[in-house]
Amino acid sequence: MTMELEEIVYKYALWNAVKHNGQAQVGPVVSKVFAERPELKANAKEVVKLAEKMVAKVNAMSLEQQTAELQKYPELLEERKKEEKKTLSPLPNVKGTVVTRFAPNPDGPLHLGNARAAVLSFEYAKMYKGKFILRFDDTDPKVKKPIKEAYDWIRDDLRWLNITWDLEFKASERMSAYYNVAKVMLEKGFAYVDTLSDAEFKAWRDSRNKTVYKPRTNPPEVNLELWEKMLNGDFDEGKAVVRIKTNPEDPDPSKIDWVMLRIIDTKRNPHPIAGDKFRVWPTYNFATAVDDHEFGITHILRAKEHTTNTEKQRWVYDYMGWEMPTVLEFGRLKLEGFMMSKSKIRGMLETGSERDDPRLPTLAGLRRRGIIPDTVREIIIQVGLKVTDATISFDNIASVNRKLLDPVAKRLMFVREGVLFKLEIPQEMKAKVPLIPARQEFREIFVKPGDEIYLDKGDVEEGKVVRLMDLCNVKIEGDRLRFLSQDLESAKRMGANIIQWVKKSESKSVNVIKADPNKDVEEIRGYGEGYFETLKPGDIVQLVRYGFARVDSISRGEITMIFAHE
C-alpha cells in the first residue's frame, strides 16, 4: 500500500469522524475510498485493513484535533458545507398565480404525517411566488369534533415550521356560502332533500336492479320547501339530508348520491366556535369543493387516500361549471416506531398526556425532544410527492437532525451519576475545550491541585488510566486521580480512553430524560460543567459522548433536558 493511499484513507477517516462527533466508522470510509479510486476494489481486503488502522488512529484523537487536521483537506470541508439539498419537482398546469392551501381539521395536534401537506403546499406556493391559504376544516361538531385549543396548536406548529400564510379562515364561519351553493344546486335539480331513513337509501343504493328512488324525483320546488324546513329546525337530526345526484350505477357505493349537508343537533354537540348557531352543516367534500373554488385554489396537494373524495368533489365542480383545481396525490408517511393515528394520539391526550409529550410524533413532541424545524422540512421535501407510501424511521430523523445541528450545537461535558475524585496534579492547568468545533470556538476551564472532579460512573474502574478531555492523563486510585502526563501522545501509547469530566465547584445538577416511545421513560441524573449556567429552556446542545439534548426546564438550579438522539 502506497503513502498516497494511506493519505486518502486517512482524510476520509477524519471526514467521517468529524461528521459523527469524533467516531469514524470503517464502512463509510471504505465506500468513500472506492468512490474516489474505483480500481482499488480489486484489493478490497487490503483497503479494509488499512481503513481499520486509520479509523483506530483517528478515533484516538480528540474532536478538536480531528477538526484541526481536517483543515488540511479543504475539498472535504467544502463537501460538508454543500451537502446537496433536494428541491421539489415542478408543478403541472401552472397558468397564472399558483394558490395552494392547507386544510387541517382542528381536532388534534399536527404530526409528521399531516404536516406533509402543509410543508409541500407552502413550499410550492413560495417556489412560484404564489399564495398559501390556511383553512380550518371544522364543519363536523359531532364525529370529528374540533378542539378549541387545536386552532392555536396548529398555528403554533406552522409558525415553528417557518410557514406563513396569506389568508386564514374557518369553514364554520362560511355557512352562508355553503347554503347559497346548496340552494342553487337544489333549484337546478342537481341535488335533492332526502327524508327517508338511511336504511331505505342504502337498500336502494345497493340494489342491483334499481327502481326509482322517490326523493330523487322530487321537483326543485319541493326540495326548496324541504330545504327551508331543514334550516328552520322542522326536522330533527338524522331525519333529513341534502344529497347530490351522481351516477346510480357507480361501482363504488360511497360515491352514489353522497350527502352534501346534514342536520347536527348542536344543542347536544355545540361547535367550539359557532356554538349552537347552526343546525345544518356541510360535509367535508361539499365544503371543500365550495371553498377551493371560491378562494381560487389552483393546486391541491393531498394524500392518495383522498382519491375518492376528489372524485366526489368533481361532481360539484361539473354541476356548477367551475374549473377543477389540479390535484396532486402522495402516499402515506409512516413514522416507524411511533403511533401516527390521530385517534390514538387524541386518546393519549384525553388520558392526560400533553401534545408535546416527547414520545409522540406530534410536531410539538418532536420539537420538545430537540428536533429542529429544518429537519422536518428537509425530510418532507426529500420524500416529496411520491405516490408510494414512505416509511421514515426515527433514525432517519436523527440523521438529518444531527447533520443540521452538528455545525452549530455547543459541545458540553455531562457525567452520569457522577463519582467524586480529588485531582492530584503538579500545578494549575488549563483545559482548552472545543465549544463549537466547526467554528473553532473554545472555552477554558482552569483546575488546580486538590480540586474535586466528577467522572461518569461508567468510566470509573480502579487502576484504570484515562485522559481527562483536553486536560491531562491520570490513573484512578481509590478516590484520587493521580497525574501521569499532559500530552495526548502519551495517552495514545497507554491506550487511555478520552473521557469527559466536570469540576465540582462549577458543576450544575442535570437531569436527562430519555422518552423512547417503545420503552419506559428513563431519567439519568448527573452533573454538567459550568457552561450549563448559560443555557436557557429551548437550547439544544451536544452532550459529549452521549448525544444531543434539549433544555426542557430550569428550576431551583436543576436543569432538566430531553434526550434527542445520539
UniProtKB/Swiss-Prot annotation:
Question: Which controlled-vocabulary keywords does the entry list?
Answer: Aminoacyl-tRNA synthetase, ATP-binding, Cytoplasm, Ligase, Nucleotide-binding, Protein biosynthesis
Q: Which top-level enzyme class is recorded in the Swiss-Prot or TrEMBL entry?
A: ligase
Q: What Pfam families does the record point to?
A: tRNA-synt_1c, tRNA-synt_1c_C, tRNA-synt_1c_C2
**What is its subcellular localisation?**
Cytoplasm
The entry's family comment says:
Belongs to the class-I aminoacyl-tRNA synthetase family. Glutamate--tRNA ligase type 2 subfamily.
According to its UniProt entry, the function of this protein is described as:
Catalyzes the attachment of glutamate to tRNA(Glu) in a two-step reaction: glutamate is first activated by ATP to form Glu-AMP and then transferred to the acceptor end of tRNA(Glu).
What name appears for this protein in its UniProt entry? Glutamate--tRNA ligase
Protein source organism: Metallosphaera sedula (strain ATCC 51363 / DSM 5348 / JCM 9185 / NBRC 15509 / TH2)
